[in-house]
């Protein structure tokens, strides 16, 4: 399942994401991963979740982000939840590119049985219509 936490900058998406990470850590029977750009969440995310600074791996663009997430899933079948903060800062600002990315991620998550939540700094009214068929918008 794919979930998008949407809203303009400063609307509380990261706080919601942190709360969701903590909830997943408490209920998951597997591993929880939180991906961020930079190291701002170091003291906010529960230590039981694997916090990954994507900049440490030189990942840029939606293709790179897709490959990174696919690698996480392929390398660890115990991952139940992946949370990605600042998705547009990692992948790029083009919402049509986001749609193409989400289509690929949806195909992967359906087979891997992984829940992925992305924070997206954009109002949902700006999204291409097809995104609403792929992801749950919050």
Show the residue positions of the predicted features:
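Generic beta-sheet signal
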Residues: 3-5, 32, 79-84, 116
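Conserved P-loop
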Residues: 1-71, 126-130
């Amino acid at each position: 399942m794919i979930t998008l936490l949407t809203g303009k900058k400063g609307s509380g998406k990261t706080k919601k994401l942190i709360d969701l990470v903590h909830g997943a850590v408490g209920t998951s029977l597997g591993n929880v991963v939180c991906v961020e750009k930079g190291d701002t969440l170091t003291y906010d995310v529960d230590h039981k979740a694997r916090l990954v600074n994507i900049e440490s791996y030189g990942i840029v663009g939606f293709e790179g982000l897709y490959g990174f997430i696919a690698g996480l899933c392929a390398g660890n079948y115990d991952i139940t939840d992946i949370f990605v903060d600042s998705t547009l800062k990692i992948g790029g600002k083009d919402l049509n590119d986001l749609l193409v990315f989400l289509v690929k991620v949806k195909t992967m998550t359906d087979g891997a049985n992984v829940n992925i939540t992305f924070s997206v700094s954009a109002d949902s009214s700006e999204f291409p219509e097809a995104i609403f068929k792929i992801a749950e918008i919050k």
